[in-house]
Amino acid sequence: MRQTILKLYEKANERDWKPWELQSEMRKIYENVVAVGDDLSFTVRLDKDVKPVSLEKFGASKVKLHPFKTAWRFERGFIAFEGKFLRISREIDKKLLEEILSVILPED
C-alpha cells in the first residue's frame, strides 16, 4: 500500500493538473481514490484503519482539517487521517512522506 500511495504522490507532482484530470489518472493507479482537492491534495480509502499516532517527532503541528479528526501540518504540506481515510498534500516532502507512511500504515 505504501508503494501505491507513493505512486499517487508522484503522479500528483508530475505537472499542474486540473483536479478532475488528476483524479481520473489516479484512479487508474488505485481505484479507491476518493477525492482530489483544488490544491491537488488527494484522499484515499484504505482497506485497514490508519494507526492514530502523533507525528510531532517529524516536526509536525496538529491542526484542524474538516472532516478529519487527526491532521498534521509540516513546514511544507500536510497529512490527515481518520479510520480508513488518508489525505495527503502534494506539497509534503517525499522522504518525509515515506517515513510517515511506514509509521501510520498497517503492514502491507
Curated annotation (Swiss-Prot):
It comes from the Archaea. This is Uncharacterized protein AF_1151. It comes from Archaeoglobus fulgidus (strain ATCC 49558 / DSM 4304 / JCM 9628 / NBRC 100126 / VC-16).
